[in-house]
Amino acid sequence: MSNTTQALSRIEAILDDSSFVEIGAGVTARSTDFNIQEKKAPSDGVITGYGVINGNLVYVYSQDATVLNGSIGEMHAKKISALYDYAMKMGAPVIGLIDCAGLRLQEATDALEGFGTIYKKMSIASGVIPQITAVYGNCGGGLAILSSLSDFTFMEDSKAKLFVNSPNALDGNNESKLDSASAKFQAEAGVVDFTGDEETIANGVRQLVSMLPANNEEDAAVSATTDDLNRACPDMAAEIADPALALSDIADDNVFVEVKASYAKEMVTGFIQVDGITIGAVANRKALYDEEGEVAEKFEPVLTVKGAYKAENFVNFCNAFEIPVLTLTNVKGFEATVAAEKGIAIASAKLTYAFANADVPKVNVITGEAYGSAYVSMNSKSLGADLVYAWPTASIGMMDSQLAAKIMYADEIAAASDVAATVSEKAAEYAKLQSSVESAAARGYVDAVIDPENTRQYVAAAFEMLFSKREVRPDKKHGTV
């Protein structure tokens, strides 16, 4: 066993007590450049092994910054690659704890080849076993690619640095003005999923592993709960502007684990459990509340480029690991800016494809506006949602009724003596005929109109019914969207 180091302490903080078993403790560096003096390198700067989290097998590696600054050399890379081989054989998650100075210069291309080997192992493991990375120190250059190949990335928020190019190497950037390697910057860029101190990271990794399946052939994790499935949610309608609150209300014991909370805040993604079963949640956000319950930020209920990519990536993960998906839909269109126009079509296409391609149980609850193609892209019935519910106050249709009235009754409105009253009258007629939940239900696009306070009850019943869902799809290697 390696000496007690910070690297080992980080492993022990994540795993169940006394469960860690080290593999490859005797491995040491094999210097491949005879022009540089060889140094002692216990475990070649990385501790590898296995243990359990709440009784579930996981494989862990932790880089030791006290040994050659935790740099990656040939044997260091081989140890991580071998750990992936074990994990793939056993169908168990891999957790990587990063604190690394980068490539080991004295091993030159041998170290570089080691990087490539790890990249390949991670790529093959993607969608087969969950991969989680926690950045505690430096994670620069090629290490940033490694962390981004994982499914979820945690980052220590005071000392850790994550970058492809260091801040002072960026054209026009002054590090004192913009620390592009900081946890805050990378979280807002969507590179990092969770930030916090080391204790928060350890607890977060444990919680996440406990909610996820061990591999793509295992059913979603099931946890014991005493929370009443028929529990009413009287505050649901008031909370829906910030779906993070609404999802907490739906969840067992009010636990919602939000993913990428600092990125594309107008789109909420994360995990809840209902009746102990893990469910991936995607929702449109109109407001973000602070700890005092005051509105901190407001958002238009539209699909944005970043929001679409965020949701697409999350839905793809859920589909890969057979995790059911719940959507809370409140979207009236697409972001309408010149900058957005450069990417919104592709981003929305990817989101649409992700929902349509996902063959896991899918439930959609329409909580507000649901207009046009943006609504269709948000897990609509036509895309394959198994069950669609709507609140009585929801609106479902081509567009906002006021705008529709102005287009459809343009001549009549122009000739009216009271334009505003005529627009309101025609808008009400259009809404009743084309945009009401009753109209959508009559056409089969909504399965039931439900009261907001009964949302948990209906969601629980829906996923229980859909538990054994199976779909037959055409044989293909993969899609190209």
Place the predicted regions along the sequence by residue:
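Ligand-binding clefts of soluble mixed alpha/beta catalytic domains
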Residues: 1-481
